[in-house]
Amino acid sequence: MDILLLERLVPEALAWLEERHSVDCRPEWAADPAAVRKAIYNAEAVVLPRKIQVTREFLDFAPRLKALARMHVGTDNTDLEACRERNVRVIQATTANVRSNAEYLLGALLLLMRRGIGSSLIGDRHADIRLGRELNGSVVGLFGLAPTAHTLALMLQPLGVRLVGYDPAVHHTAPIWRRLQVQPLSLPEMLAQADSVSVQMMYASRYQGFINEKVLAHCKPGKLWVGTSRSHLFDGDALAAALKDGRIEACMLDGAEAGFASKGSPLHELENLFLTPRIGSHTRESRLRASWYVAHRLHETLAPRSGAMDQITSVPMGLDPGAEPRRAAFIIR
């Protein structure tokens, strides 16, 4: 067996791989650690779901492994040093969900700008709803310049939004700010000026609890927050206090970690906190992009070519699941 799939690719990408390699698609084994350990022993490459941790012990059960791939972004579940030591290539579809996450953030901003959306969604037509606002003429703060922020900036500018931003890893003189037409500010300045904040900062363990009481003290009252970053960026107590005292009028976050707002948490049952189960990146289009990226990189790793070109057929996914796909050929070098 060349490739073990513990997470499915789209059918077209799977068929393309099967024409070139021995592929075993067994997503049902992902919940059985014993089955996974047994299956990876003979695999040269594996596609893993988010929930499977790659540790040194995991790699001990995969002596032939040359590549491991994931359809999602993030390396906190992978021991990268151990992979480097064993010459295992780590493949991630890092840009596949950029546009889908940017669209989620834009949609979340538009929803929260219409105050009372929570009452309206549950059918309360007589709720005491404050007047909403429009994005046009407002100031949006981009917290983090991850690739999603680049696409979001291009979406917001035609709507008449003034963009300000902050990223602890990007100097205020970096050309990217000018290129995106985003005014770089210090964190206190951004929070003081922005009417709403979009959080898409790349997460690292050193940023755990980065958005704390000291940071949120700079929020002007009534700010709206949306985000697709890891919820570990937030200090739960500080966020709860800001949601309760009005510094943050409403907050919508995608993909919060387990326990973030569960019973016993200060965020539990706050009516102005909206959590969605990682739906920002969960689109047909992003799944298609991720599947083809992973398929191409796996083939590249297992069948390296010296100057040859491989004809690859990609099948764009339309919005109608029953429609006959169009076939578009392109070259991978």
Enumerate the language-model features and the residues they cover.
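An N-terminal-biased, well-structured beta-alpha scaffold segment characteristic
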Residues: 1-91, 192, 212-214, 218
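Hydrophobic/small residue at the entry helix of a nucleotide-binding pocket
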Residues: 148
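Conserved acidic E/D residue at the C-terminus of a beta-strand in Rossmann-like folds
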Residues: 167
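Phosphate-coordination loops involved in phosphoryl transfer and adenosine-cofactor binding
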Residues: 65, 136-139, 222
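Rossmann-like adenosine-cofactor binding region
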Residues: 54-56, 170-266, 282
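Phosphate-binding beta-alpha-beta segment of Rossmann-like dinucleotide-binding domains, i.e.
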Residues: 86-143, 151-159, 309-310
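Rossmann-like dinucleotide-binding domain for NAD(H)/NADP(H)
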Residues: 104, 222, 228-333
